[in-house]
């Protein structure tokens, strides 16, 4: 038992060292080398090569179809000995048999890049899955690459306006930065990503790449239809977005590599065409989860909470490639599922250190009916600085956070003693804070079909002026519900006017009934 344990640990060490070497090594003379399947354990396949095993991360093709409708691609992740490689399958291994013939491709998994990919849907291997024929690409690139050198990286501190009030005001996003949307199941991460695609990608001059990592097939279809409706994807004209899917019904190998496939396409637009690229990843936790499954299948000893011992390295290798260079930039928006709403879970906690802005979605906020369910007191942004954003913006944002913090403190007193026991100053703070909370809600354009409310894109200047007026008491006479699920302050005043007219009409009807009853 001890001998097997020691050999398993050594095999894991070999795979890590080999992975670093393979990512930078040129294609060797092992292309076309033939091997045979020697063992199949679910998604893990051992392949024996009489002439020596190819390097780690080499892609292998199973030549014998054995009644399968689709080809099978493997990726070497460990060297068991000089002639045997342990591989992870990118598709299901159903019908795969021992002694099946396997051929080395001579390099990593590669995907098509360039403008020919725009408007198309791909899987982890770069195969088009939208049933629209061949892509006709002129170039393919390997999905494994090293991060740009420090000298080639560039930092930019410009605000990326989203049109979403709570984001633009309290946690502004940075162009060329990495943004995380943290939240448990069903609090609205995907809806916010779809609204950001709608608001930012439509008005964005460059291209966008969307990576669907381990999420629902239905959501992928909805996103594709939404993009066609908004003309981000135009089947008859010029599209601006590429979709790459490795969904939750696929093996862990596909889910563990699909983010690299999408990132490779984004890197081409950044490095070769000098574009400012938007990269959307939904969900980065599924990337970590897939790598954890792969690690368990390879027999590695798990670390904290059952995650793989290489959690930080796996995530770091991906995140360090998402950066801005002197040629172009990649702005990344990543949804991060929080298991059991525990933000200290190793997967989301490890992701925190890579981000420029963190947007925390709170289930308690969602249950109170405020959407987007952002908790402004838990969020942070690197560019929330008066040297980057305007001084007025900074001051208003800080005052909003301060008032919401005071309101949270007063809620405990209200729960015990009631609001009547507060001082007049505190009562005023509570009244304005409740309006602030309602005003942070906003109907989304992508959710119009579900909510029945018209979506709003709010300009940054309008957002700052509206919240500034609310803090100063300009709208103290406006009823609280007029601030709920609206756009800018003009929408608030229109809703308040409509509410007053409806109240007057109801009062008129009541008086008419009273008069009729008395007569």
From Swiss-Prot:
Q: Which CDD domains match?
A: ATP-synt_F1_beta_C (cd18110), ATP-synt_F1_beta_N (cd18115), F1-ATPase_beta_CD (cd01133)
Q: Where does ATP bind?
A: 184-191, 216
Cell compartment(s), UniProt: Mitochondrion; Mitochondrion inner membrane
Listed under catalytic activity are: ATP + H2O + 4 H(+)(in) = ADP + phosphate + 5 H(+)(out)
**How the protein sits in the membrane?**
Peripheral membrane protein
Q: Does the keyword Endoplasmic reticulum apply?
A: no
Name the domain of life.
Answer: Eukaryota
Q: Which InterPro entries match?
A: AAA+_ATPase, ATP-synt_VA_C, ATP_synth_F1_bsu, ATPase_alpha/beta_chains, ATPase_F1/V1/A1_a/bsu_N, ATPase_F1/V1/A1_a/bsu_N_sf, ATPase_F1/V1/A1_a/bsu_nucl-bd, ATPase_F1/V1_b/a_C
What does the annotation say about its assembly with partners?
F-type ATPases have 2 components, F(1) - the catalytic core - and F(o) - the membrane proton channel. F(1) has five subunits: alpha(3), beta(3), gamma(1), delta(1), epsilon(1), plus the additional subunit P18 (Tb427.05.1710) that is not present in F(1)F(o) ATP synthase from metazoa. Subunit P18 (Tb927.5.1710) interacts with the alpha subunit with a 1:1 stoichiometry; the interaction is direct. Subunit gamma is part of the central stalk. F(o) has three main subunits: a, b and c.
Summarizing the function annotation, the protein's role is: Mitochondrial membrane ATP synthase (F(1)F(o) ATP synthase) produces ATP from ADP in the presence of a proton gradient across the membrane which is generated by electron transport complexes of the respiratory chain. F-type ATPases consist of two structural domains, F(1) - containing the extramembraneous catalytic core, and F(o) - containing the membrane proton channel, linked together by a central stalk and a peripheral stalk. During catalysis, ATP synthesis in the catalytic domain of F(1) is coupled via a rotary mechanism of the central stalk subunits to proton translocation.
What family classification does the UniProt entry report for this protein?
Answer: Belongs to the ATPase alpha/beta chains family.
The protein's name: ATP synthase subunit beta, mitochondrial
Q: Which organism is it from?
A: Trypanosoma brucei brucei
């Amino acid at each position: 038992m001890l001998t097997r344990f020691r050999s398993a640990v050594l095999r894991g060490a070999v795979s890590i060292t080999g992975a670093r070497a393979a990512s930078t090594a040129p294609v060797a003379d092992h292309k076309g080398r033939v091997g045979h399947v020697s063992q199949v354990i679910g998604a893990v396949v051992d392949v024996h090569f009489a002439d020596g095993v190819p390097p780690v991360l080499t892609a292998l093709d199973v030549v014998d179809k054995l009644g399968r409708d689709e080809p099978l691609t493997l990726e070497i992740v460990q060297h068991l000995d000089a002639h045997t490689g342990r591989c992870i399958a990118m598709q299901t291994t159903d019908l795969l048999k021992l002694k099946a013939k396997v051929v080395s491709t001579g390099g990593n998994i590669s995907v098509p890049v360039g403008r020919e990919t725009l408007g198309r849907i791909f899987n982890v291997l770069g195969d088009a899955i939208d049933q629209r024929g061949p892509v006709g690409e002129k170039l393919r690139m390997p999905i494994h690459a090293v991060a740009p050198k420090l000298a080639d990286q560039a930092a930019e501190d410009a605000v990326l306006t989203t049109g979403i009030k709570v984001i633009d005001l309290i946690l502004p996003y940075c162009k060329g930065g990495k943004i995380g949307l943290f939240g448990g199941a069903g609090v609205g991460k995907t809806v916010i990503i779809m609204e950001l695609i709608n608001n930012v990608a439509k008005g964005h001059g460059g291209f966008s790449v969307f990576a669907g990592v381990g999420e629902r097939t239905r959501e992928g279809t909805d996103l594709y239809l939404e993009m066609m409706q908004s003309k981000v994807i135009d089947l008859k004209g010029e599209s601006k977005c590429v979709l790459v899917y490795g969904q939750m019904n696929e093996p862990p190998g596909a889910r563990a590599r699909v983010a690299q496939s999408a990132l490779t396409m984004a890197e081409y637009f950044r490095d070769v065409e000098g574009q400012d690229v938007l990269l959307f990843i939904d969900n980065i936790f599924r990337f970590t989860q897939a790598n954890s499954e792969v690690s368990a299948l390879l027999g590695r000893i798990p670390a904290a909470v059952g995650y793989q011992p290489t959690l930080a390295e796996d995530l770091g290798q991906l995140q360090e490639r998402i950066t801005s260079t002197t040629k172009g930039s990649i702005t990344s928006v990543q949804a991060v599922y929080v298991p059991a709403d525990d933000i200290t879970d190793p997967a989301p906690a490890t992701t925190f250190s890579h981000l420029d802005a963190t947007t925390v979605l709170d289930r308690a906020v969602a249950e109170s009916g405020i959407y987007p369910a952002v908790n402004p007191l838990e969020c942070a942004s690197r560019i929330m600085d008066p040297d980057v954003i305007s001084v007025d913006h900074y001051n208003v944002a800080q005052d909003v956070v301060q008032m919401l913090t005071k309101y949270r403190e007063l809620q405990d007193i209200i729960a015990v003693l009631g609001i009547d026991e507060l001082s007049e100053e505190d009562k005023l703070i509570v009244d304005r804070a409740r309006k602030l909370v309602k005003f942070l809600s906003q109907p989304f354009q992508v959710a119009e079909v579900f909510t029945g409310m018209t979506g709003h894109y709010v300009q940054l200047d309008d957002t700052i002026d509206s919240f500034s007026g609310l803090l100063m008491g300009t709208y103290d006479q406006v009823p609280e519900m007029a601030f709920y699920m609206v756009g800018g302050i003009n929408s608030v005043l229109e809703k308040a006017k409509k509410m007053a007219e409806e109240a007057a009409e109801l009062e008129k009807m009541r008086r008419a009934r009273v008069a009729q009853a008395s007569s």
